[in-house]
UniProtKB/Swiss-Prot annotation:
UniProt entry tagged with the keyword Transmembrane: yes
Gene name per UniProt: Adra2a
Principal location listed in the UniProt entry: membrane
Residues modified to Omega-N-methylarginine: R368
Protein name per UniProt: Alpha-2A adrenergic receptor
TM spans (from-to): 49-74, 86-111, 122-144, 165-188, 208-232, 390-414, 425-445
Lineage: Eukaryota, Metazoa, Chordata, Craniata, Vertebrata
Length: 465
């Protein structure tokens, strides 16, 4: 992505998509003469084989991981939530990076020149910027989706339909295209000038200062800033709400807003509980039923909600139809969470008069509620730590993979010399983000782990049978 063969010379531009002769590239030990001859590759045979193997593993891991994500979303009932369509689109972009961009970048790297012609050079550069930018903007969209689901819990989750999510995904691709394609149609193609004799064709991204700065801001710095601010805000909200001790909650905390009996509208019921990264499923259900700034409904269920949240919707979705538990009868209105409650756990209390006969009428409920509050308090502290870790991974990996490249890319544009080997390393390191996205956004989520196990172990079960 944004490939630059060498540091820029003042006033020398290689427009995007042009085939630029580059006689002075010091990375080539020899070149082919116009009449024929042999080309010396920029790397030794051992280094070339190592680079090919590493890039091949990167491509295989990227394709394999992202294909697993797509299959899991479309085959697991626990992952049918509309917001998981973001992951499908993100995985598709990463697969396209691994199949349509990385192979040609690898060939260009190990051969030392562009072999595939001018037309494919323009297409390759446009696709490179498009797919990589799309991957980054997808992460930004996921963070905004999570933020809105917290700050506008019921209202936003009622609007979070597959059609709306698809519209947002289309917007993400349009934004990426706006950043990627204008140089192909708006920049006049120019030669090297100065009467240099062609030596080797090279395929280089537009290095004009205005494009480098604007594309870097649009492709990385702006989405990165949005992600950081959004995640900081999410953490602040979660921290404020999870640190309200149960003993300080007022009697009003036990009541839920109208329509709170069924938790599906706020996106946290059995079919919508699975957030893209697992972070959304961590602290949010404890506060989303109240108005902004209010603590979550306090009741016996909260003591166990911390444990139940790990299973989210998967426990409900994977349980085959069978006899109902004996305590389900009088509590049909709590079907969303009741299906996830383990034997011995109490069911959600929707209001003073909504509890079933097993939840009130004796001192057992109050006695259990007191112990549950203490357990809930300890669980919330642990949950806050886990949530902090997930956010640190999401933001940290994103910045670590992309910041070095975009920083040096901008430095080159403004005239600061950067060693070509260092720039090439950062260039390839940015591609690693496409392979790490499945790890970050799925391995931390219990529902995806279950779906992956089902997909990967399906063949073993068939052989055993």
């Amino acid at each position: 992505m944004f490939r630059q063969e060498q540091p820029l010379a003042e006033g020398s531009f290689a427009p995007m998509g042009s085939l630029q002769p580059d006689a002075g590239n010091s990375s080539w030990n020899g070149t082919e003469a116009p009449g024929g001859g042999t080309r010396a590759t920029p790397y030794s045979l051992q280094v070339t084989l190592t680079l090919v193997c590493l890039a091949g593993l990167l491509m295989l891991f990227t394709v394999f991981g992202n294909v697993l994500v797509i299959i899991a979303v479309f085959t697991s009932r626990a992952l049918k939530a509309p917001q998981n369509l973001f992951l499908v689109s993100l995985a598709s972009a990463d697969i396209l990076v691994a199949t349509l961009v990385i192979p040609f970048s690898l060939a260009n790297e190990v051969m030392g020149y562009w072999y595939f012609g001018k037309v494919w050079c323009e297409i390759y550069l446009a696709l490179d910027v498009l797919f990589c930018t799309s991957s980054i903007v997808h992460l930004c969209a996921i963070s905004l989706d999570r933020y809105w689901s917290i700050t506008q819990a019921i209202e936003y989750n009622l609007k979070r339909t597959p059609r709306r999510i698809k519209a947002i995904i289309v917007t993400v691709w349009v934004i990426s295209a706006v950043i990627s394609f204008p140089p192909l149609i708006s920049i006049e193609k120019k030669g090297a000038g100065g009467g240099q004799q062609p030596a080797e064709p090279s395929c280089k991204i537009n290095d004009q200062k205005w494009y480098v700065i604007s594309s870097s801001i649009g492709s990385f710095f702006a989405p990165c800033l949005i992600m950081i601010l959004v995640y900081v805000r999410i953490y602040q909200i979660a921290k404020r709400r999870t640190r309200v001790p149960p003993s300080r909650r007022g009697p009003d905390a036990c009541s839920a807003p109208p329509g709170g009996a069924d938790r599906r509208p706020n996106g946290l019921g059995p079919e919508r509980g699975a957030g893209p990264t697992g972070a959304e499923a961590e602290p949010l259900p404890t506060q989303l039923n109240g108005a902004p700034g209010e603590p979550a409904p306090a009741g016996p269920r909260d003591g166990d909600a911390l444990d139940l949240e790990e299973s989210s919707s998967s426990e409900h979705a994977e349980r085959p139809p069978g006899p109902r538990r004996p305590d389900r009868g009088p509590r049909a209105k709590g079907k969303t969470r009741a299906s996830q409650v383990k034997p011995g756990d109490s069911l959600p209390r929707r209001g003073p008069g909504a509890a079933g006969p097993g939840a009130s009428g004796s001192g057992h409920g109050e006695e259990r509620g007191g112990g549950a509050k203490a357990s809930r308090w300890r669980g919330r502290q642990n949950r806050e730590k886990r949530f902090t870790f997930v956010l640190a991974v999401v933001i940290g990996v994103f910045v670590v993979c992309w910041f070095p490249f975009f920083f040096t890319y901008t430095l080159i544009a403004v005239g600061c010399p950067v060693p070509s080997q260092l720039f090439n390393f950062f260039f390839w390191f940015g591609y690693c983000n496409s392979s790490l996205n499945p790890v970050i956004y799925t391995i931390f989520n219990h529902d995806f782990r279950r779906a992956f196990k089902k997909i990967l172990c399906r063949g073993d079960r068939k052989r055993i049978v």
